[in-house]
Amino acid sequence: MTFRSPIFELSHTYIDDEAALSPMGCTYLGNGLNQDKLDDFSIAGAAVSADLTRKTLKKLLALKPIDEIDRIAQTVMQERLESSLALHDSQESFVLWNVLTSPPSNVRSIFELMPKSTDKDFDNIAKRLAAVDGAYKSWTGAIMEVAKGGKTTAQRQVRGVIEQLTNYANGGFSAMCKNFDAAGKYPAIHENAKLAEKAAAETAEFLKSQYLPIANPEDAVGADRYAVWARYFTGAKLDLRATYEWGMADLKAINARMWEIAGQIKPGAKTLREVADHLDKDPKYVIKGKENVVKFLQDFTDAAIARMDGEYFEIDDRIKICEARLAPEGSASAPYYNPPSEDLSRPGTTWIPMLGKDEASSWHLVSTWYHEAVPGHHLQCATVAIEKERLSRFQINGAWISGYGEGWALYAERFMNELGAFDEPGIEMGYLSAQALRAARI
């Protein structure tokens, strides 16, 4: 293979080398390697990955860019590798897990991205299910070791992950396998689903009895720890006080607008929760049945792509497919997006968690699906996936920065607001509630 520069070549090699240490990373890439295994979440496993990162960073800094494209590729890779090492060296990477992302939920969701066409595919699924116990144990061993140094996850998040694991244990993996193989052609996956459920039950009990009592009773982590994560999530060194004050001011402005809209939706309402409950019950927005929710979101996504293409963006034909699917029970508690595989054989996918319900309300889904699909994450990530001439392989697959990544999707919502997509009061309230959540996070 010919590369435009040594920096692009190193980027390409690093993605391969890192994927070799992460079977789940291979699945995300779609390269077909190690599909019968799961990641090693142990401290020793993380050390191997950190060693690779350190060696790669040293090689990267010794290279000279040949042009502006190269300079940007090098700068992005350097910042991400340095931020990743900061998390590893401080052991922060072992304590940021929650109801949105954690090794248990990532293990569960990776099965949804695996190929399911051949006998070999199902053999991989069976073997990977059998590996769940080992993956979970490698993780619990790591977090207990880190806890000895005083670093633990917030109790509220621990309880949430226990609940997710309990969902997996109570038939979650079996239901998944029935969905994959309704005819029962591959008995091994159904048998091994029981093993995975046993592992989930044992892990939930371990967290409840061993980890929860020593977990952090507070959500706050303090300025020093916050700064490490702020750098990782934004790629920048922030003035934390100024950022906090900006977030508070933004939340105040959003809140004021929400109350203006609340008066149009439910005059006399005493709380915004009361307004949200009213919208949840409004027949105009209620979608009954999981299949109908998915159909609504798929139709919505297809319509958004058709509307945006040619008028506001030139969307490549290769990325005009973006699927809407049901998220596994017990997975992330909010909608999310998975980019396409490197070769585009697996399309970009949006996921809707139903949280045990059989209906949803569209008033808050409209802005969310502009955020997740088009012109949000799908347009963003799928476009990046095909820009192989201008972006290094690391920029495409390894350089996700929330400040830019989520910033794009948040702007996508604001862009649609500018186009009048949220003129209806209920839909605007959904948009504003999502904006308020992001401002409150800051």
Give the ranges of each region predicted by the language model.
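N-terminal maturation segment of proteins
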Residues: 1-442
